[in-house]
Amino acid sequence: MGTLQGGLRKVVARVSREQQETAAEGVAVSIRHVGKRFGSVAALDDVSLEIRRGEFFSLLGPSGCGKTTLLRSIGGFEAPTEGDILIEGRSVLHLAPYERPTNMIFQHLALFPHLDVRENVGFGLRMKGADRTDSARRVEEALRLVRLEGYGERRVDQLSGGQRQRVAMARALVNDPAVLLLDEPLGALDLQLRLQMQEELRRLQRQLGATFVFVTHDQGEAMAMSDRIAVMSAGRLQQVGTPAEIYERPANRFVATFVGHANLIEARLTGGVAGGIAEAEAAGGLTVSGRAPTQRSADGAVLAVLRYEKIRVRAAEAAEPGVPATVIERTYMGSSLRFTCRTAEGVLLTADSPNAAPERDIGEGAAVRLSWSPADIALLTD
């Protein structure tokens, strides 16, 4: 019995030490081997990641990938089937949503139409029995933070969509959460308002130095706002990194296709590696050497990922070096032009060029030369 008790004390001490170390390392949220099943469907499959204190972290992926389930698990609205979730070094699985140091902003906001702005913002404080004087001060501070001074007595139905978003933000921030959870809060807004609210959210996050965990399926939104991004698919993490790392160095085919536009070229390694660049060749002998893959398949097969905007398009008569090709389709996209070209080897490549001379003078059927840097090609084996 004494041996068992001693063992239990050691386990408790080890867990407590790990939690203290997590908090000391500046980790706001630690997701440890979290799984969630709905019947036979795995919504989350062995997800592990750490979200740093004070960062804007986005969960990005298509519908049904598990990103909202993960967010709801952090907030306590879903219970993981397995694994653990720590916030500020403390496991929160046993805590109800209102007991966790988090607040959530939902896509549909859930504002109370029968309450004015001030009452909506202060609702959580009132439910906690906070001091009235202190609550009034904090509500006014929150309204000032989201630039809604003077709107306290307005009804929710008297506000624009953007103003309602700000009320929802103020209501969440007034409780001073350690982590703010945002479940696609901008999804229902039109484009211009969405862009404005992106800037507003980023400004707030930087001003407060708070930890924001943001769910979105919009890659542009995630790129513009995030310090780091976790790309998810089918309940699994595909890649975690900065926007630049995700875009420039995709971990696999899914990330390469889901984030941004890219030419995907089946190729084979043909030589060694020099300066981090591996020699590779596609069908017909087209050279697509690029950044060496982290591992090599037995047959040397790779996927060359070349972003549209990395390709330079020039008229053949310009006598610039490059791959000979013919423009088979030209699409006007406003600020840019999209050229679909067939190389002499028969490979189709798409390039995005600025809507400016000399590119805008190139039409369909034109002979062109395509060029790019090997450093702009990512060679993948996954």
Question: What do these predicted ranges mean?
Answer:
Residues 2-13, 17, 262-264, 272-382:
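Non-catalytic connector elements of ABC transporters
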Residues 60-62:
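The feature captures the beta-strand-to-loop junction immediately N-terminal to the Walker
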Residues 68-71, 167:
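ABC ATPase nucleotide-binding domain helices that frame the ATP-binding cleft
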Residues 75:
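Helix-to-loop junction immediately C-terminal to a conserved catalytic motif
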Residues 83-91:
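Conserved ABC transporter NBD signature motif
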